[in-house]
Amino acid sequence: MSIVTDIFLPLALAFIMFALGLGLTGSDFLRVIKQPKDFFVGAISQIILLPIVAFILVKIWPISPELAIGVMIIAAAPGGVTSNILTSFAKGDVALSISLTAIISLLSVITVPFILISSLNLLGSESIVQNISLVSMAMSMFLIVTVPVIIGMIFRKFAENTAVKFESFAKKISVVLFIIVLLGAILAEKDNIISYFTDAGFITLVLNILMMVIAFYVAQLLGTGIPQKKCIAIECGLQNGTLAIFVGTTLFGGGAFIIPAAPYSLIMFVTSLVFVFFVRKTNNS
């Protein structure tokens, strides 16, 4: 598994983030100014509410400390790149989805370490915290997440036609890489996979559904439009599973720490597709 975790996993994540960068332009970042309320409702839901809901669940749920930390890792991860596609299927605000995914992914260099260190302290895992360097965690994420996104954006800026042509293919490769990483994580724990899925599967299902519902109604309460509500709900339901597995592997050595990312990564597509079907049916009726 060392070749997979030491070489393939970081390269796969870097390519996925590069593919994200290929699709970004300056307007995706200016949307924070043009649609400040919609953006900040989405960002707060994902960066603050999602980890809080996850933390409450792991505190009341009878799971091991390792699995609890694994749940917090997936909750701390930014939105997945496929959220843009599913937002489109749901007839949501795709432009807002792209902005949320891009900016929160870039902010993850700060938010993920902060959320994880805070969670470990609150969960009483001080011994684990002592073995983690906040600086090295942020630096690793900067190199694997931020730098590839910036490279993708630069490529788009100076070779736009080539970037546009390659973007669709790159996103397909990203999906394949994500599946390979997910299967690798599952196979690495094949001896314990059934018990892990039994322990972590239901809590990740509850977290996913609960957060999509909360995000949808928080957005409604704060007066965002219907397309924006759909977008924010999907953004809070689809997390970057590859990044979660990378963090769990590099910081905690894999094992039970990365297991919650596996069922969550499967569940989130099912629940998101159900959500898409429901909102499209509602729109047509």
What is each residue range found by the language model?
Residues M1-S285:
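Alpha-helical transmembrane segments of multi-pass small-molecule/ion transporters
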